[in-house]
A protein has these predicted regions:
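Catalytic-core "active-site belt" of small-molecule-metabolizing enzymes
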Residues: 1-89, 93, 101-126
Length: 126
């Protein structure tokens, strides 16, 4: 098991259409390439997961940042609670939430996301 960082993208057009029909909006979260993510750092080498800074830049501008200890639940609490409900296995991804600053990404945007001292990755929106 390990830790990384990723983007949990939402297609707002699909979300709005589903909401208007009173339907679940799973398709707005599960489209192709909807969850770009970094490589994983083995849990044994991850160190402190309480006070590290989580951040996102878009086109070189800082859009989101927060300390992991500002999250509603800690990483260990989320894993503990989910493991009561699901058999967590290698390959499962758990997205923890996001700091303030959520905004649309548009084709051509370049992003970089990371957790200080742990991992970072970059990509672009096609």
């Amino acid at each position: 098991f390990g830790y990384g960082v990723g983007l949990d993208l939402t297609r707002r057009d699909l979300q709005a259409a589903a909401k208007a029909k009173g339907m679940p909006w799973d398709t707005a979260k599960g489209f192709d390439h909807s969850a770009p993510a970094s490589e994983l750092v083995p849990a044994a080498g991850a160190g402190d997961l309480v006070t590290r800074r989580l951040w996102l830049t878009v086109n070189g501008d800082l859009r989101q940042q927060s300390s992991l200890d500002d999250m509603v639940f800690s990483v260990s609490e989320v894993i503990h609670e989910l493991s009561k409900l699901f058999a967590l296995k290698a390959g499962d991804l758990i997205f923890m939430g996001t700091p303030a600053g959520v905004a649309a990404l548009v084709p051509g945007d370049r992003f970089e996301a990371g957790v200080d001292g742990l991992v970072a990755f970059s990509g672009h929106i096609a």
